[in-house]
Amino acid sequence: MHERYVPADVEAAAQGDWRAADAYKTREDSQKPKFYCVSMLPYPSGKLHMGHVRNYTINDVMYRYLRMNGYNTLMPMGWDAFGMPAENAAMANGVPPAKWTYDNIDYMKGQMQSMGLAIDWSREIATCKPDYYKWNQWLFLKMLEKGIAYKKTGTVNWDPVDQTVLANEQVIDGRGWRSGALVEKREIPMYYLRITQYADELLNDLDGLGWPERVKIMQQNWIGKSFGVNFGFPYELDGEKALLRVFTTRADTIMGVTFCAVAAEHPLATRLAQGKPELQAFIDECKRGGVAEADVATMEKKGVATGFSVSHPLTGEPVEVWIGNYVLMSYGEGAVMGVPGHDERDFAFAKKYGLPIKQVIASEGQTYSLDAWQEWYGDKETAVCVNSGKYDGLRYADAVDAVAADLKAGGYGDKQVTWRLRDWGVSRQRYWGTPIPIIHCPSCGDVPVPEQDLPVVLPEDLVPDGSGNPLAKSEAFLNCSCPKCGAAAKRETDTMDTFVDSSWYFSRYTAPDADTMVDARTDYWMPMDQYIGGIEHAILHLLYSRFWTKVMRDLGLVKFGEPAKNLLTQGMVLNETFYREDASGKKTWYNPADVTVTHDDKGRPVGATLNTDGQPVVLGGIEKMSKSKNNGVDPQVLIDQYGADTARLFTMFAAPPEQQLEWSGAGVEGASRFLRRVWSFGATNREALAARAGFDAAALGDADKALRREIYSVLKQADFDYQRLQYNTVVSAAMKMLNAIDGAKGATPAVLRETYGVLLRVLYPVVPHVTFELWKALGYADEFGPLLDAPWPKVDEAALEQAEIELVLQVNGKVRGALKVAKGASRDAIEAAAVADEAFAKFSDGKPAKKIVVVPGRLVNIVV
């Protein structure tokens, strides 16, 4: 073996052995417990970033540790390859999205392989491949048969110049990102999946998952089960009687209604705008706004009075109807009751437009004022009804019951459970996605593609230009025959939401070569024992994958109803930021590698200059690594300079997996230095370490016993930390082990070999290359087999036994020293040793002991 640690050589040798042995190809094995750990599959953006490195290393560490503990472990990988970024890149570079995507996959796969990850590449999938998305189409058709998939109109952002639908993020200040045209809202037919049919189950099943509590809460809030009252305000228009329906969770405040607001798309708004240009102009303005709930939450709340009133269902008083830009047709009934006295948004709206504000609940000790909103105005826990006629004095629950009963008696409404969750719209007016398997026939209407004709293959040679969906212009794709009547027909040009692709890929990993969607192997591996990904996926991806899994179960495809037993949301990787700001306020961000930072005497950064010109830059603080802040670190540069093991060691040591990790160049150098020490000890002592000599543990000398005691004590903690996924303290344990072994004076070669072998196995899951090569070079592989499957070291409990124990020695309650006594020594022996100790003589001022307190195994306190 080399005297010097050369990461490139070590890693090439180890990876060569793993490839030759097909070391990570995994098969089902009923004789072993299984452990299926999956990292959320990446989007092939071009290069890995440090967040990827951290995520995959966590997964890899878990895999290797459990494999050593006898588990049949599986770590697969794939590519979430469809989506809008590929279309944007294609437009920018003039190449088909397919070429851009496949080139990126090739590069990123090479990066992953250079990290030494234990991936079973025989299971690799790319969601843009027909043999994968065929099953998206197949299940969609099954859902269509069962009524889970259906078609209805939905609201989209429409660019009238480019004649195309825009995603929410492509609408900038109400204009199309490419054309600059004012964006309109349009109603178009789209396909939806009835995720709401599973709302109760999705909510209730969260309780049985080993997921972070904050993720569960985020999903609970998104599903949003609400108990309230659905009722209508009666009105008459053009001789027709009808109800303006609303849903509220605060029926106790119904006597405080002073207006109603409807969405711009509400049928009543459309009717009331006829012949009123100012109303129609406002409706058109609303339709140019964003269609996402998040957009509505942050936009300025605007409204226009219609001049029309409905009647209050309990008092008969007129209630003015407004059109509000903050009311979404896709949520609830597309109309809301306005109670400005007790809803903060309504309060602001009423103050803005001079609408009446009525107090109808009161809280003891609180004074109501119209001057400014106070938090207690919306309280339902302690408040009672006032100014509400027969409901005065009732608390929230009783008031809701009474109001609901009266509304029901009048035929206006009743109690209702509603959900914030909405059905999943899966139609996307984009090219680079799974084609929706529907054919439009002028005679037969919408006809599902027959199962035997799947997949509907997406052409991969089209280059989008931003002016509409390329599929609509591709005659070869578009034109077909109707499966029912044989007449000329057109294919559906919408593609599926890319969340469909990521909703079941983990099941396909288990049976990648199956000629069905999944097979019996899926029930062996699934559900995932551990899923790893960022908190940003807490809602949509994780919720959709849970729904998709339950649909697969109900269709008899699988036996499980949840995709993942346990979830780890790894923390973000942070780095310093630096920038300069020009006169217009525009910031230019500089990469930390191009900046020199000066520090004060306490190590705090106090200034920074750009290396190219020596001029100052502003310290922007520590933020998440991102392209926008230009503060990323290229993992490939790190691997090329220090080796993959150093990158892995640093990312595991710098912080616990679930916490944020602050990048540190000094930390990387420290990780590299530690690995050089591990290697150097092995190389320097290779003759002693390679000698396979047995020993009698009982006959060992003090130095050997002390070293074994230290190593097995630390091993016990490291094993516990591996089990609780605290890999940073595992690395700390390994550092303690090396210090103990390297500093052991008088230890015999046999004990050095034993303890160094423990160190290599403890470190192996984190830094597999260097430990694998040392294990082989020092002859451990000949004795125990390759490190890949070497058994996890067991703690020798006998080695932890001590002939002597150390007690804290106190004089008058103050620590004055340490006292070594024989393990099992009698109380008299301990007291005698204590008063004979030189610390007692020094701190007792010559006074005799009045009292001696012995706390067994812990301390002796001499009172003088």
From Swiss-Prot:
GO molecular function per UniProt: aminoacyl-tRNA deacylase activity; ATP binding; leucine-tRNA ligase activity
Protein name in the entry: Leucine--tRNA ligase
Record motif 'KMSKS' region, residues: 624-628
Keywords: Aminoacyl-tRNA synthetase, ATP-binding, Cytoplasm, Ligase, Nucleotide-binding, Protein biosynthesis
Organism superkingdom: Bacteria
Gene3D superfamilies: 2.20.28.290, 3.10.20.590, HUPs, Isoleucyl-tRNA Synthetase, Domain 1
Main location (coarse class): cytoplasm
Subcellular location, record wording: Cytoplasm
Catalysed reaction, written as an equation: tRNA(Leu) + L-leucine + ATP = L-leucyl-tRNA(Leu) + AMP + diphosphate
Family: Belongs to the class-I aminoacyl-tRNA synthetase family.
PROSITE patterns with a match to the protein in the record: AA_TRNA_LIGASE_I (PS00178)
Gene Ontology terms: cellular component: cytosol
GO biological process, one term: leucyl-tRNA aminoacylation
EC number: 6.1.1.4
Species this chain originates from: Burkholderia ambifaria (strain MC40-6)
Motif 'HIGH' region per UniProt: ranges: 42-52
Top-level EC class as recorded in UniProt: ligase
Pfam families in the record: Anticodon_1, tRNA-synt_1, tRNA-synt_1_2, tRNA-synt_1g
Chain positions recorded as ATP binding sites: K627
InterPro entries registered for this protein in UniProt: aa-tRNA-synth_I_CS, aa-tRNA-synth_Ia, Leu-tRNA-ligase, Leu_tRNA-synth_edit, M/V/L/I-tRNA-synth_anticd-bd, Methionyl/Leucyl_tRNA_Synth, Rossmann-like_a/b/a_fold, tRNAsynth_Ia_anticodon-bd
